C-alpha cells in the first residue's frame, strides 16, 4: 500500500449558520455540504456561500449529474437542486450512514461504526454488495474508476483508495493530527473536498496524479465482488 501525507491546498468556512459538516458533494460548479437541518452550497473559486435548501442533512451527500441525494437518518432523499423539492425517498441500509457517492448508475453508502460501504440500487435502496473496512467510514467518493473513502478515528483521519471488488486498501493520504474527515468528494480532477466535522470547514486536498495505464486497470463499480 502506498502511503503519503495529505496536501491541503485550501480551507473554506466556517460558514454562517453551519456549525458542522457531515457530507460533501460537487455538482461541477458548486460544492454542497450537509449542515444538519440544511444543504448548503458555496462557490469553490471564491469560497462564498451561495444558497441553502431546507432539508434534513445529517450525513452523506451525492450528485448524479442532475439531482442531489442526501442521507438523513434511515433514509436517502433525492432532491431537485433548483427547487429544493424532494422527488423520491428510499431506505438507507440499516445501521446509519456516514458517506454517499454516485457511481455510474448506483449509490455507495458508507457506514461509520459498522465500518462498511454498501453499493445500493438508487431506485429501491436494495443492497447490491458490501465492502468491509477496518476503520470507521466517514465519507465516500468515486472518480475516474477509483473508490475512495474517508476515515476518522480518535485524532487520526485519512483518505483511502480501495479496490471496489475486495476492499483492499491500495493507497492512503494521512491528514494532519486533529484534522478530521467527515464527508468526501472528488471534483473530477486533481482535488478532493473533505468535510471537517464540527470545525464547520471544508478542505481541498490535492489528489494524487495517475497515468492512463493506472486508470485503465481500475475496476468498474458494476463488477462482482470477490468472496
Regions found by a protein language model. Name each.
Residues 26-28, 63-65, 102-104, 142-144, ...:
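Residue-level detector of Asp-centered blade-edge/turn motifs that repeat once per structural unit
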Residues 12-37, 59:
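Beta-strand-rich domains and repeat architectures in extracellular enzymes and scaffolds
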Residues 181-227:
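Blade-level signature of beta-propeller repeat domains, shared across WD40, Kelch, NHL, RCC1
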Residues 12-17, 52-56, 89-93, 130-134, ...:
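Surface loop/turn motifs at the tips and blade-to-blade linkers of beta-strand repeat domains
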Amino acid at each position: 500500500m502506498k502511503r503519503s501525507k495529505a496536501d491541503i491546498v485550501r480551507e473554506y468556512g466556517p460558514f454562517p449558520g453551519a456549525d458542522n459538516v457531515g457530507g460533501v458533494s460537487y455538482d461541477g460548479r458548486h460544492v454542497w455540504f450537509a449542515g444538519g437541518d440544511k444543504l448548503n452550497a458555496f462557490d469553490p473559486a471564491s469560497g462564498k456561500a451561495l444558497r441553502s435548501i431546507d432539508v434534513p442533512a445529517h450525513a452523506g451527500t451525492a450528485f448524479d449529474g442532475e439531482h442531489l441525494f442526501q442521507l438523513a437518518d434511515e433514509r436517502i432523499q433525492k432532491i431537485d437542486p433548483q427547487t429544493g423539492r424532494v422527488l423520491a425517498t428510499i431506505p438507507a441500509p440499516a445501521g446509519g450512514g456516514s458517506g454517499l457517492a454516485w457511481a455510474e448508475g448506483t449509490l455507495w453508502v458508507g457506514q461509520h461504526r459498522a465500518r462498511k460501504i454498501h453499493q445500493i440500487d438508487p431506485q429501491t435502496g436494495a443492497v447490491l454488495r458490501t465492502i468491509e473496512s477496518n476503520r470507521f467510514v466517514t465519507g465516500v467518493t468515486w472518480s475516474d474508476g477509483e473508490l475512495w473513502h474517508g476515515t476518522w478515528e480518535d485524532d487520526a483521519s485519512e483518505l483511502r483508495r480501495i479496490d471496489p471488488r475486495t476492499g483492499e486498501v491500495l493507497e492512503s493520504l494521512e491528514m494532519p493530527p486533529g484534522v478530521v474527515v467527515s464527508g468526501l468528494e472528488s471534483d473530477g480532477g486533481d482535488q478532493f473536498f473533505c468535510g471537517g466535522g464540527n470545525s464547520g470547514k471544508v478542505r481541498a486536498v490535492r489528489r494524487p496524479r495517475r497515468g492512463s495505464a493506472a486508470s485503465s486497470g481500475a475496476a468498474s463499480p458494476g463488477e462482482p465482488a470477490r468472496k
